[in-house]
Regions:
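Alpha-helix capping and helix-loop boundary segments enriched in small/acidic/polar residues
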Residues: 18, 37-41, 231-239
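Iron-sulfur cluster-binding electron-transfer modules in prokaryotic oxidoreductases
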Residues: 87-297
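N-terminal, well-ordered alpha-helical segments
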Residues: 28, 48-52, 66-69, 75, ...
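N-terminal glycine-rich anion-binding loops that anchor highly charged ligand groups
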Residues: 25, 39-42, 217-219
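Cysteine-centered iron-sulfur cluster-binding motifs in ferredoxin-type domains/subunits
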Residues: 14-33, 61, 65-85
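Non-heme iron-sulfur electron-transfer modules
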Residues: 1-6, 33-63, 84-112
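Short, intrinsically disordered, charge-biased short linear motifs at domain edges
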Residues: 5-17, 57-68, 178-179, 212-214
Length: 297
């Protein structure tokens, strides 16, 4: 029974599935389709495949898994769609149903359920990765590093950002008062996000300094973790996503404003209610939480 198709989540967006007029306009804009011009990798093809899957009560095959994974959720197709189909919602729902039906697999299970939700453990693993990076990844311009030679050839010499020597949570206090001689106008909690915390802490530090100079007292809860975007938006693990969302709601419960400089974090947290709320209580909590979130990037 576990392999059978689930429709609990994607079924909520069945009307969006029916909106597609199969005009093919998405083929001109999809970044995945530009690299892999196959019908199954563009919104039109995915829409049809998901409709067929729901109609026939089929199963999530390996081909379907591959098709669902080939989407960055950039919404470029939706922005240029003549009927404004909300394809992103369809993809997120289908990924959740696929994960519920087929499971995550060992490596994603280790990363998304056992590592990322445990912030201290995650930070320790990232710290170990930073040592590996210094040993085997030559430094390039600025804060970027080359992949090791044996991978660089396979991945076209790509660069990745260097992991910071000191995380943001270790650079700033939990309570950051406004600058001397400045009147406190607002009090806001700061959601760092993984990239700012581990890779670009100087951005977060400068943001806090700017806000405190302009009358904003900034609280940085040290127990905060990931927004959950890679887990429930990317991997479709709604169960772990709810656990993370519940934790964030609890940590930031007393905040009047929640600010972040990460667009991914802000968009993910604002969508908790739409995708993850499976009870009336969660719907209320997530809705109240999302109203406090502000992207200040």
């Amino acid at each position: 029974m576990k392999d059978k198709t689930g429709t609990e989540n994607v079924g909520k967006f069945y009307n969006e599935l029916k909106e597609c007029i199969e005009c093919g306009n998405c083929t001109f804009w999809c970044p995945i389709y530009q690299q892999r011009p196959e019908e199954k990798y563009v919104a039109r093809g995915k829409n049809q495949a998901i409709r067929d899957l729901l109609t026939t009560k089929g199963e999530y095959s390996a081909e379907m898994k591959d098709m669902l994974s080939m989407c960055t959720l950039c919404s470029t197709c939706a922005q240029h769609c003549p009927v404004k189909s909300k394809f992103q919602s369809i993809m997120i729902g289908a990924r959740a149903d696929q994960t519920k039906a087929k499971g995550l697999g060992l490596l994603p299970w280790l990363i998304y359920r056992q590592l990322i939700p445990r912030r201290k453990l995650f930070g320790s693993v990232v710290r170990c990765a930073s040592y590996f990076q210094k040993l085997f990844m030559p430094k390039a311009e600025g804060r970027m590093r080359h992949l090791p030679l044996f991978l660089s050839g396979l991945l076209q010499g790509r660069l990745i950002p260097a992991i910071a020597d000191c995380y943001l949570r270790d650079l700033v206090p939990e309570t950051n008062k406004v600058s001397s001689g400045t009147q406190t106008r607002y009090k806001a909690a700061y959601f760092m996000g993984c990239a700012t915390d581990f890779v670009f802490p100087e951005i977060g530090k400068k943001l806090i300094e700017y806000l405190t100079r302009n009358g904003v007292e900034v609280i940085v809860p040290k127990e905060q973790g990931c927004c959950g975007a890679p887990i429930w938006l990317g991997a479709g693990d709604f169960d772990t996503g709810r656990t993370i969302a519940d934790t964030n709601v609890k940590i930031f419960n007393e905040a009047d404003y929640i600010i972040t400089n990460c667009a991914t974090c802000s968009s993910a947290m604002k969508e908790y209610a739409k995708y993850l709320a499976d009870t009336d209580a969660r719907l209320r909590r997530y809705s109240d939480f999302s109203k406090k979130v502000y992207d200040i990037s």
